[in-house]
Amino acid sequence: MLADLFERLFPRQQASRDTVKQRLKLVLAHDRADLSPELLQKMRQEILEVVSRYVELDSEGMELSLENDQRVTALVANLPIRRVKPATAEG
């Protein structure tokens, strides 16, 4: 009963465990994909620049990560869209 109370009052242990697990997955994916953190950051910036030409993004919810299974490493972008920008004439 007391343990349940502590678990409810201090649930961060599970969250921190999940955070560590996600960080480890990211490090492993970086190693397997041979992407440096600097290159990943540059890719992130360029992706955001291109997407921002067409839509307004919610910067708080943005997330870019590498996910890895046994065969494939995937770059996953979660980019919350606030609104689509009006079409502009490009030359």
Swiss-Prot record:
GO process terms (BP): cell division; regulation of division septum assembly
Keyword terms of this UniProt record: Cell cycle, Cell division
Organism of provenance: Synechococcus elongatus (strain ATCC 33912 / PCC 7942 / FACHB-805) (Anacystis nidulans R2)
Lineage start: Bacteria, Bacillati, Cyanobacteriota, Cyanophyceae, Synechococcales
Protein function: Prevents the cell division inhibition by proteins MinC and MinD at internal division sites while permitting inhibition at polar sites. This ensures cell division at the proper site by restricting the formation of a division septum at the midpoint of the long axis of the cell.
Matches recorded under HAMAP family: MinE
Presence of the UniProt keyword Chloroplast in the record: no
InterPro entries: MinE, MinE_sf
Highest taxon above the source species: Bacteria
Protein name: Cell division topological specificity factor
Record family assignment: Belongs to the MinE family.
Pfam families assigned: MinE
